[in-house]
C-alpha cells in the first residue's frame, strides 16, 4: 500500500544517491492562433493559446479524498493509489508529475452590426457577446495546467470564465 522507489545506483538502499531529474517545467513550444471572420453584418473572432511538452508537479493530489475509493486496502490490494496515510513522507517521484500540455480557447466574440443612416449621430451600432477562458483541452487532473515557471501546481481557484454582453455605438 505504499509508493515504491527505484534503487537507481543499485546499492541496496534508497538514499540521496538514487535521486534523478524528473520532468521539465519548460515547454518544448508555445503557440497561439487568432481567427477573425466577417460575413455581411456578422463578425466572429476566436483566440487560442497552447503550451506543449512541459511537465507539472501536481502537489494538490498528494492525499485527496476524491480518489480515496481507489486507494489500496487490505481487501483490495490492486487499486491504483496507495493507502491513505497522514504521516507519509512525500518524497517526490514521477507519481505526481503530469503532462502540462494544453490548448485553451482564451477568447471568443460574436457580434452583429446594424447600419444606421449617415445623417444620425452614429453610423452603426454593433451588439456582441464575448467570453474569456471558454474551455481548456488538457489531460491534466488539476483545475488549470497553466502554472508558473516552477512547474508546481498547488491547487487554488481555477481561472474564471467571464461573459460580456455589450454594444458599440
Can you describe what each PLM-predicted range is?
Residues 1-26, 43-101:
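Surface-exposed, extracytoplasmic segments of Gram-negative outer-membrane nutrient-acquisition systems
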Residues 24, 28, 33-42:
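Long hydrophobic segments that form regular secondary structure
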Residues 34, 69-169:
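Membrane-interface anchoring segments and C-terminal beta-barrel signals
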Residues 38, 49-51, 130-134:
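Outer-membrane beta-barrel pore domains and translocons
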Residues 41-44, 117-118:
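Repeated loop/turn-to-beta-strand initiation elements of outer-membrane beta-barrel proteins
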Amino acid at each position: 500500500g505504499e509508493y515504491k522507489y527505484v534503487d537507481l545506483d543499485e546499492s541496496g538502499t534508497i538514499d540521496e544517491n538514487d535521486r534523478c531529474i524528473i520532468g521539465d517545467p519548460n515547454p518544448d513550444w508555445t503557440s497561439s492562433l487568432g481567427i477573425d471572420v466577417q460575413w455581411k453584418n456578422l463578425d466572429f473572432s476566436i483566440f487560442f493559446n497552447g503550451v506543449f511538452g512541459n511537465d507539472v508537479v501536481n502537489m494538490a493530489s498528494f492525499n485527496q479524498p476524491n480518489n480515496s475509493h481507489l486507494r489500496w486496502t487490505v481487501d483490495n490490494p490492486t487499486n491504483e493509489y496507495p493507502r491513505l496515510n497522514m504521516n507519509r513522507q512525500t518524497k517526490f517521484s514521477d507519481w505526481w508529475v503530469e503532462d502540462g500540455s494544453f490548448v485553451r480557447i482564451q477568447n471568443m466574440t460574436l457580434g452583429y452590426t446594424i447600419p444606421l443612416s449617415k445623417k444620425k449621430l452614429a453610423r452603426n451600432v454593433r451588439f456582441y457577446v464575448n467570453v474569456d477562458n471558454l474551455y481548456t483541452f488538457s489531460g491534466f487532473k488539476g483545475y488549470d495546467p497553466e502554472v508558473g515557471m516552477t512547474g508546481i501546481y498547488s491547487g487554488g481557484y481555477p481561472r474564471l470564465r467571464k461573459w460580456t454582453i455589450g454594444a458599440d455605438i
